[in-house]
Amino acid sequence: MLRRGETGLAGAPTHVQADRMFEIDPAFSATSQALGDLALSHARLQADARFPWIVLIPRRVGARELEDLAAGERDVLMDEVLRAGAAARAVAEALGRPAAKLNIGQLGNITPQLHVHVIARRPDDAAWPAPVWGFGVAEAYAPAAQAAAEAAARRALGL
């Protein structure tokens, strides 16, 4: 685990630190679909058809806050957030609901594992202008929409 003030690992990110394997919190597995791994983060599509929503989970054991990442890793994460923004916009386009605004948040109040939400929003979406967290009940994607959303997100992320 990286501790505050440490420089982190040199070179490519790894799934293993301090003899422990990186694992995704079960809450993410229950509420989202895996898209694939970027240089630092595991990318997922949130399972809520109301909002084109990408979640990035940096593959760092024990990371809970941005400050738990080395400076270079934070730079990589910011690049991945921008790519996730393009992916959320691509999902919105694929679903016929172009995005007007991106919401980006790193909360962790409920699921403490470090993660970043990137959500494409529109003035006519179910929660606008309020935050999407805790708004109503998630709506499952129809199978064709799920496939289109995943394909659009993966293309935009380069996966």
Regions of interest found by a model, annotated:
Residues 1-19:
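N-terminal amphipathic/basic-hydrophobic helices that include classical n-h-c signal peptides
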Residues 16-159:
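HIT superfamily nucleotide-processing domains
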